[in-house]
Amino acid sequence: VPLSPDLFSLQGLRNLGPRLRQWRTEWEERLTKNPEPSLKLPSGRMQPTGYIMMQHAMRLDRPVKAYERWIACIPEIYRNYVLDEPGGQRLSVANDPHRLALLKHYQSLMPLAQESHKPMFQLKPADGAGGAHIQAVRNVYRDFKELATELARRTGIALPQPD
């Protein structure tokens, strides 16, 4: 689940969890009413894998105070509403086992990537990613590789090994 530290993401989580549970119940009913037994239907046991938190711009290596309040609410709201687990110990996003990644605000790389029609981690100097952007592109590549690796691990998908 992609999230930003804002009210819209919190409200989205509050809506998503109950809707997923309703969808599973409705799907179970549909499975029993399958008119064609030879038609193999998925079990419908979709489970959330976690959430990805997008940081807003940092100030002195920490989020702006207004965003910190929203960020602090995410782990509990995710656990309570999406996973339907009762509140337990209060976790920070940094220590939450359900957090897949905490992606930084890559500032000017996003518009460069959009203009170049390519992912941020494939930007080259010819795309305008020169100077300090070169290190930022490397950081984006590392961050997305870590995210892909974690997603694959949690979902049991084998990643291709580099040659």
Predicted regions and their residues:
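C-terminal lobe/tail of nucleotide-utilizing enzymes
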Residues: 31-163
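Conserved Switch II/interswitch segment of TRAFAC-class P-loop GTPases
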Residues: 1-30, 59-67
